[in-house]
């Protein structure tokens, strides 16, 4: 296809009467020497292919073909130099090497072909020079890229502390044990360094100020995390006993430490115990079990419950069936179902510190057990000879403190 284009170009320029240095013009040469034109078009294909219309778009095709014909016609030396300068201004991709063997009609060609062959080594040398320069320049850029990528990969393998980016390529600082000891000692005395001390430590430890500042920032964050973890541990450890239900012995100790209680006699383990105390020491223990009012005078107190009241009973809203005794009697806290509760005097409109329990208008308080209390239980005033063992007739003025007896059935 290239041959056809160059034949066409030679036919196009056949009409021009362009005279070379040796006196030959193109009109006669095209007719007299067809083999020479064939050889010229074959031989100068690399020089013309260097400046094809595709690679050099700002040149007209006529100018390119004219430059090719000028080189083939062995003009004076300034014309090929201009073409070669144009070649160097726009370096194309490296051309294919020229054919090593030339066809035999070259020997019978005119002086123009001989001069073109003598001119050809300069063209090939220029092509090889451009071929050496342009890939060498390109290769140097690639080498620079490879060097930067290899250096960045080495730094990343060494371990980067900063996030990856083109601007930050600072490697992770490795502190020696002596430096760490000095830094920890300084942090123990002062968590925030002033600048003079930081400069002094930087000179002492052979570090930069920035490294010391960043180490102190990280150490403060670690200290804050440790303190937060310790605080959570202590708070969870301190709250766990409070959330757990109070055992009977602990509840008894709490009641005895708050108020001096009288001695309680041994009893059947299924029945709760009653502790006598003065009226002015009445208080509401934060439990949800109201105690009934006792209708006995203090020397003849009875137990406020029966064996039917089990420790697992649940408190219900107050009801009006079978209220206890007469007003203006002393209230006493009652140990019912593993917790101490207290009975309030019925003389005034006092309430428990409980949100879901109200005070009945009659002034009498009642509670319901796990099963309703049957009618055969004795709810009237105590007789002078109680069924259960009486409490000690001595009041808390004796100062004796008695713990609640341990229940064996729980």
UniProtKB/Swiss-Prot annotation:
What is this protein's name? Homeobox protein Hox-A3
Q: Subcellular location, in the record's words?
A: Nucleus
Alphabetical list of InterPro entries matching this protein? DUF4074, HD, HD_metazoa, Homeobox_Antennapedia_CS, Homeobox_CS, Homeodomain-like_sf
Indicate, by first and last residue, each region the UniProt record lists as having compositional bias (Low complexity).
Answer: 104-122
Q: Which CDD domains match?
A: homeodomain (cd00086)
Question: Which regions of the protein are recorded as binding DNA?
Answer: 168-227
Single Gene Ontology BP annotation: anterior/posterior pattern specification
Region (Disordered), start-end ranges: 29-126, 139-173, 368-410
Provide this UniProt record's keywords sorted from A to Z: Developmental protein, DNA-binding, Homeobox, Nucleus, Transcription, Transcription regulation
Q: What are the record's GO terms for cellular component?
A: nucleus
> SMART domains of this UniProt entry?
HOX
Q: Where is this motif: Antp-type hexapeptide?
A: 133-138
- Which protein family is named in the record? Belongs to the Antp homeobox family.
Organism ancestry: Eukaryota, Metazoa, Chordata, Craniata, Vertebrata
């Amino acid at each position: 296809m290239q041959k056809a284009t160059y034949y066409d170009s030679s036919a196009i320029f056949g009409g021009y009467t362009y005279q070379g240095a040796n006196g030959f013009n193109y009109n006669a040469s095209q007719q007299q020497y067809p083999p020479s034109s064939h050889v010229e078009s074959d031989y100068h294909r690399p020089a013309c292919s260097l400046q094809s219309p595709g690679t050099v778009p700002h040149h007209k095709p006529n100018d390119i073909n004219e430059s090719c014909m000028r080189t083939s016609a062995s003009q004076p030396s300034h014309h090929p130099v201009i073409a070669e300068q144009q070649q160097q201004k726009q370096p194309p991709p490296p051309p294919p090497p020229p054919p090593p063997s030339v066809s035999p009609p070259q020997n019978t060609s005119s002086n123009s072909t001989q001069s073109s062959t003598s001119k050809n080594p300069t063209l090939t040398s220029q092509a090889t020079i451009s071929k050496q320069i342009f890939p060498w320049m390109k290769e140097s850029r690639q080498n620079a890229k490879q060097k930067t990528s290899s250096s960045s990969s080495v730094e990343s393998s060494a371990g980067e502390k900063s996030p990856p980016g083109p601007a930050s390529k600072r490697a992770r600082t490795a502190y020696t044990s002596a430096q760490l000891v000095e830094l920890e000692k300084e942090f123990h005395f002062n968590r925030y360094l002033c600048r003079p001390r930081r400069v002094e430590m930087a000179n002492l430890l052979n570090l930069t100020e920035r490294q010391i500042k960043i180490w102190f920032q990280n150490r403060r964050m670690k200290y804050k995390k440790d303190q937060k973890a310790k605080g959570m541990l202590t708070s969870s450890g301190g709250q766990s006993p409070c959330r757990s239900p109070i055992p009977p012995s602990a509840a008894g100790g709490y009641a005895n430490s708050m108020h001096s209680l009288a001695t309680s006699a041994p009893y059947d383990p299924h029945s709760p115990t009653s502790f006598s105390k003065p009226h002015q020491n009445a208080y509401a223990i934060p439990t949800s079990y109201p105690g009934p009012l006792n209708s006995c005078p203090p020397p003849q107190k009875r137990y406020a419950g029966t064996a039917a009241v089990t420790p697992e009973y649940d408190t219900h809203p107050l009801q009006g069936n079978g209220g206890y005794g007469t007003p203006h009697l002393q209230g006493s806290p009652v140990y019912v179902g593993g917790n101490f509760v207290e009975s309030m005097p019925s003389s005034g409109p006092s309430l428990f510190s409980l949100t879901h329990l109200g005070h009945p208008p009659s002034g009498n308080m009642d509670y319901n057990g796990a099963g309703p209390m049957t009618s055969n239980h004795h709810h009237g005033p105590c007789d002078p000879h109680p069924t259960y063992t009486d409490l000690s007739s001595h009041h808390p003025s004796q100062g004796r403190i008695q713990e609640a007896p341990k229940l064996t059935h729980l």
